[in-house]
Amino acid sequence: MLLSLITMSGLLATSLAGPWRAALDLAGGTLKFRIEIEAEGTALSGRLCNGQQCDTFSSIRVLGDSVRFELADYAATITAVLRGDSLVGFYRNVGNRGPRVIPFRASRGELSTSAAPEWLAGRWYALFRGTIGDTPRIFEFRDGPAGLEGTIIGNSGDYSHFSGEATRDSFALSRFDGSFVYLLAGRLVGDTLRGTFHAGLKAQTPFVAVRARGPSPLKLPTDVTRADTTAPFRFAFRDVNGRLVQSDDPQFRGKVLVVDAFGTWCPTCHEAAPALVDLYRSRHPLGLEMVGLAYEVSGDTAVDAALVRRYRDKFDIPFPLLLAGTNDVDAAGATLPQLVGFTAFPTTIFIGRDGRVRQVHAGFYGPATGAQHGALVAEFAREVDLLLAEPVPVGGP
């Protein structure tokens, strides 16, 4: 029996190789994405892709007629059973409001794509219609190497890469990376886009959008969260090894300090990490220090520490990462009482040599925003350089 099970698993592993058209069945629509699987003997590797943006599975395991895809960065899994040329199962992820379980299916072959039609391509000013008011957003659609792609931009950064297809007057773009589950679907009605933004299994938010004209409807990222600048910025949290790290430790005295409030569950934080590491490595010899404050899902120290270690190793982060709390925005904000209006992960805090906050940047513009991403990375460097040029205060902060 054991031998036959091992043989079956080996045959299944080999047969899984190739491209798969995958989907999550949400309450109000279908989120499409691509899975690519490679086999080397019975060992499998693969990627989950939205257009040209791909996330590598940490492991793919086969047992009998079942396959388990793991995305350890986000504590997420896809488990499915092979039925002919189809996979049927569930996506699971543990969120701060409890586990998410969403039906999953896939069939062999390439995912259909289309170019960005002229009526859709470009920038749109959108309103997400809520029960307590409207929320401004910006939609950007363009032609990419893999067809129609785009992003959504809010006050605290972008929603990363979306990809999909469009017909004569309708469109649907998806974003799924193992953590966030997004579907943007709509139709052109006259000169207006109307549709629904889906987040997770059930959440649905109607939207309207018009061609972008005039000033942006969004706040500047530096105007979202305010800080008390009258006293030195204070923090005291433990690192993944249990060592207490505090703002008044000798390593920070008289230094420029950048504090990154992040979460390993946050794809935008993953996009920001390489830029922060590059900034640290180039300016650390000049007097820059950095600290990451991790706000995680589980609240279990051992579980959260393991995820933060994985995040640290993934990006080769050389500065301390501290366990600061859970990712509930209100609870996280309470751990940083000098900030007012904390709303976003990541939030980047720039602190001068005197220990006082000089700027707070909510969110991050990732590569999906194109030129905005490059401009933001350059802005971070300019802010640090201005602070480094200031004299070290006598006696320290």
Each PLM stretch: what is its role?
Residues 271-316, 328-335:
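Structural microenvironment flanking redox-active thiols in thiol-disulfide oxidoreductases
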Residues 235-257, 280-283:
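A short beta-strand-turn-helix
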Residues 95, 201, 252, 364-367:
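A short acidic/small-residue loop/turn micro-motif
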